[in-house]
Amino acid sequence: MSDLDYYQVLGVSRTASQEEIKRAYRKLVLKYHPDHNPGDKNAEQKIKNINEAYDILKDEKKRSAYDQLGHQAFKNSGGGNYQQHHGFTGGIDPNDIFENIFGDFMGARRSSKTAFSKKAGANLKYDISLTLEEAFYGVTKIISFKTALTCDACAGKGSLDNNSTSSCPTCRGSGVTRSQQGFFFFENTCQTCRGAGHVIKNPCTKCYGEGRYINTRNLEVKIPAGVKEGSRIKLTGEGEAGSRGGKTGDLYVCITLIPHNTFSVDGNDLHCQLDINCTTAALGGEVEVADITGSKLKLKIPAGTQNNHKLKLSGKGMQILHSDRCGNMIVHVNIKVPKSLTKSQRELMIKLDKELNEASEEGFLSKVRNFWASGSE
């Protein structure tokens, strides 16, 4: 291990955040990457120093030990040189810059053994919120998202010429390198070619040999009538672009419904609340209700309707997906009792209450008489 000042190597302060350290590392790796500096021994040494510094500073425990003890914290841990083999070492991959840009876009890391081969793009997920009316009628939305797009400069090949690859100079085509730490020997995936055994000879200057680059994409999405909460629409070939001609992934648009002021959804049925007064509940009648389209509908209230009774309007619910049919509209009746009465209303209610109680008592006495009459026979 060298006696470098790791903070100076990365060009950051000792109080730098992990994000600042990572950003500085990415910038330096791009600048001194061997693809951009072929045969430059100075650039090769700088990359080694950059990787060594990043390996320590990206790890909070190693960084803390370094801050307290400097290089002495690591000199007794392995008994050997920190780096003794060719190429990029110390467990840090200079191609991590591409991992961070592309591989982590959907949380999927790229395999080191296919780093310089065709690789399919990741499937993407996009969450979209719709009003209930939009879900009922269907709607076209323009969505905007960042993703990996096929590089137009190299047509996705990653190379500026047809003879795109050559044998890796670091591992000589084997895909592995060997290192020694103390008495132990280790065989590692070559970090120049990432195990492929070959490298891009003349990489594209726009995508750095990746065959794709990050940019914002605008896409028109047609959402059919009748989608529900949690519905998922698959758009084949609209996901992340593959690397170096790999297959493009798919895009999944996931639906969330914004709560409605009037209706709630249960399957294909729409539920709503209706307040009626106690006289309408007792006598029955006809009221107007509005459906999801705003149309006024006549609803009959049967005489003697009880609180929380449900009334159904057939075919007035949600549009059924990929169909010309609709679910039902379920109306929940809430009987409202007046909080205050006029003198005449109060007198009428007292009279009604008396008559109802008398009818109830008469019915009870009639049942008793019938019981004794049947028992005496």
Curated annotation (Swiss-Prot):
Keyword Cytoplasm included in the entry's annotation: yes
Coiled coil regions in record: none
Subcellular location: Cytoplasm
Cofactor(s) required for function per UniProt: Zn(2+)
Name listed for the protein in its UniProt record: Chaperone protein DnaJ
Cofactor note: Binds 2 Zn(2+) ions per monomer.
Positions annotated as zinc finger (CR-type): 138-216
Gene3D superfamilies linked to this entry: DnaJ domain (1.10.287.110), Heat shock protein DnaJ, cysteine-rich domain (2.10.230.10), Urease metallochaperone UreE, N-terminal domain (2.60.260.20)
SUPFAM superfamilies (alphabetical): Chaperone J-domain (SSF46565), DnaJ/Hsp40 cysteine-rich domain (SSF57938), HSP40/DnaJ peptide-binding domain (SSF49493)
CXXCXGXG motif repeat residue intervals: 151-158, 168-175, 190-197, 204-211
Cellular component, GO annotation: cytoplasm
InterPro entries in the cross-refs: DnaJ, DnaJ_C, DnaJ_domain, HSP40/DnaJ_pept-bd, HSP_DnaJ_Cys-rich_dom, HSP_DnaJ_Cys-rich_dom_sf, J_dom_sf
